[in-house]
Amino acid sequence: MPKHYRPTGKKKEGNAARYMTRSQALKHLQVNLNLFRRLCIVKGIFPREPKKKIKGNHHTYYHVKDIAFLMHEPLLEKFREIKTYQKKVKKAKAKKNEELARLLLTRQPTYKLDRLIRERYPTFIDALRDLDDCLTMVHLFAVLPASDRENLEVKRVHNCRRLTHEWQAYISRSHALRKVFVSVKGIYYQAEIEGQKITWLTPHAIQQVFTNDVDFGVLLTFLEFYETLLAFINFKLYHSLNVKYPPILDSRLEALAADLYALSRYIDASSRGMAVEPKVDASFSSQSNDREESELRLAQLQHQLPSSEPGALMHLVADNNKEVEEDEETRVCKSLFKDLKFFLSREVPRESLQLVITAFGGMVSWEGEGAPFKEDDESITHHIIDKPSAGHLYLSRVYVQPQWIYDCVNARIILPTEKYLVGRIPPPHLSPFVDNEAEGYVPDYAETIKRLQAAARNEVLPLPGVGKEDLEDPQNLLYAGVMSRAEEAEAAKNKKKMAAQEKQYHEELKMEINGSKDVVAPVLAEGEGEESVPDAMQIAQEDADMPKVLMSRKKRKLYDAMKISQSRKRSGVEIIEQRKKRLNDTQPSS
């Protein structure tokens, strides 16, 4: 028997040994499809794409090591135990033994995903990097109505709302918010925590409707994992501020749907108490609860104090009592709305504006009981309103639309309010997530904002083609001007020569077509022979194609893809400019 002989079925090699199909994985684990999906979601296992699919393209493949990883998961045994226990409950209900069924439901086995969080995210930075989808999902379910058909319970909706308010309270107190954009899908936010940029989407404050084309079973499994992950992150973030977690809210404010305001007051009171009294004697342990409650009430009453007052005690690290070093971006964001007081009308998105204003150093209030200050407060500087008001108008404040808040935040300056007054069409709401220079089109209002930013920094905007280093070094600018003038003169001379040669070529070609025997004297430059001169455009095209000929196939394809992308971008810019021109032409007539 030759050495290379291998009996069929004895050993697999290559992709057949590294991957298995989903049906093979189900047989290997002895679970159904729903349970397999739950395990893959909570464990972070996803399908693979092998280069050579042994069983065909219509199968889903998983790595063999991932399936072996699931085989030894303790959660698998817990799911089987729960399934067996549910059969006992079902049997008791079938025998109409309601008391036994109720007793069994109270003793049903439970499980936690804490171990999986620590397993999937060894460090806190790893968890922050994977937080975008988590925040978007939790914010979505926080506004959904409870549904028995989709197995969405009320307590789960309340838990999502609690987690989102805790997250927003930390973002507001730490001034970590960086960008906000209101779109048709919802409101996009971007915050920066420990150097990580976190972007999430929140739905608008309207009635949400369940759709039939979404598998809510899979979404609820993701939500179960994301709730645990966000609770871990909130715990870590609150302890970095010396604040106890979970927070204890004022029941009165919580009943008035002022959860975010109650959380902010709780953070202020907790940080003040922990920073002033880092150690408490055991003899005063009986009075500690009363002291904490009194400080919480005091913080709720002292709502008119700006957040940059002795609340700087919030910026203490948990392990040592030293101030946290703030970067320049945080300092700018913290003082953008400093000493400004805003009042929100009923029709504006209160929760979003409250988060944005407080995150950038402002004070905010609203209509209703439990608000920090009343509408008739003379110190209010801006009244956020979305429709003309028939009530009393105060001359000491400015009535602006909500878009003014978001545009000021993205521009990092206080914009003029003339274009945002009530009843006027506001300027375009520009996205801070788009790089206008890279896209090749800069809107007019973006240029206006850039000039306002330069004026706020007492800077001089350079002319097109002139950089800041040229303004700082005039001699360099003069030298560049002289060189560019010499280059322009030489280019003009070459252009004139090429035009003469091209004209001669066209005349010769025309005479040849007409059958004329007259010969036009060639127009030659000094030092050139009597050879026929090719077209200037052809020479330029050959020069442009020469580097492409010398490229490898891979680089040539990449170059072609870049050219296609640039042409599409240029065509998109041309479409935008045409629409802008048509709009400008129709505006005066209307």
UniProtKB/Swiss-Prot annotation:
GO terms for molecular function: mRNA binding; ribonucleoprotein complex binding. Keywords: Nucleus, Ribosome biogenesis, rRNA processing. Residues 561-590 are annotated as: Disordered. It is found in: Nucleus, Nucleolus; Nucleus, Nucleoplasm. Residues 332-422 form the BRCT domain. Expressed in shoot and root apical meristems, epidermal cells and vasculature of developing leaves, trichome progenitor cells, young flowers, developing pollen grains and ovules, and mature pollen grains. One of its GO terms (biological process) is maturation of LSU-rRNA from tricistronic rRNA transcript (SSU-rRNA, 5.8S rRNA, LSU-rRNA). Its main location: nucleus. Required for maturation of ribosomal RNAs and formation of the large ribosomal subunit. Plays an essential role in cell growth and survival through its regulation of ribosome biogenesis and mitotic progression. Required for normal root cell growth and differentiation. Plants silencing PES display severely compromised root meristem structures and a reduction of the primary root length of up to two-thirds. This is Pescadillo homolog. It comes from Arabidopsis thaliana (Mouse-ear cress).
